Amino acid sequence: PYRRQRQMCIRDSSKGMSIEAEVGSIGGVEDGVVGNGEIADPAECAKITDLGIDFLAAGIGNIHGVYPANWKGLDFEALDRIHKATNNIPLVLHGGTGIPDDMIAKAISLGVSKININTECQLVFAEATRKYIEEGKDQQGKGFDPRKLLAPGAKAIEAKCKEKIELFGCAGKG
């Protein structure tokens, strides 16, 4: 049933492209799709891995966007089963924003090698840009120039990424 996808993986990887697949429903709200943070089936993950993908993102209770107060956390037993079922393919954690540092560290120890934190970057960008405007800096000189107006947000994203690089243990790695 995955013949077409397999052909795409072969074609794309032959052109030097990395292929990441998402299995199961990653919860949260993204592009109008709402999910609750389901747990992916390790057998399905193994089938998808056999297509020739390079990275696998699987639902382990994670969600896109901001986590609600009643979030139950990541399912590390499921993560371990998925990692073993997929022959140690590099795993991706979608919805990394707001996951406690200790959970991130444990996920990395169980095979996660890429963590998406887009929402976190968007939030710090918005906060820094809002502060710039609320302080009236957009009204001073040419503070309305988009390069000046957006600079605090860009710097906030840079600072957040540096913080996460340290947390994820990536500093100094190629």
Predicted feature locations:
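Structural preference for beta-strand elements that scaffold enzyme active sites
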Residues: G16-E20, D54-A57, P90-V92, K114-N116
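Single conserved hydrophobic/aromatic residue that forms the stacking wall/gate
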Residues: P1-I10
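Glycine-rich phosphate-binding active-site loops on the catalytic face of alpha/beta enzymes
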Residues: R4, I60-G65, L110-A126
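Extended, intrinsically disordered, low-complexity segments
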Residues: I133-G174
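Glycine/Thr-rich beta-alpha phosphate-binding loop at enzyme active sites
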Residues: L51-E77
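Catalytic cores of alpha/beta
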Residues: G96-L110
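Active-site glycine- and acidic-residue-rich loops that bind
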Residues: R4, G27-A43
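Active-site beta-loop-alpha junctions enriched in small/polar residues
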Residues: E22-G32, G59-I63, H94-G98, N118-Q122
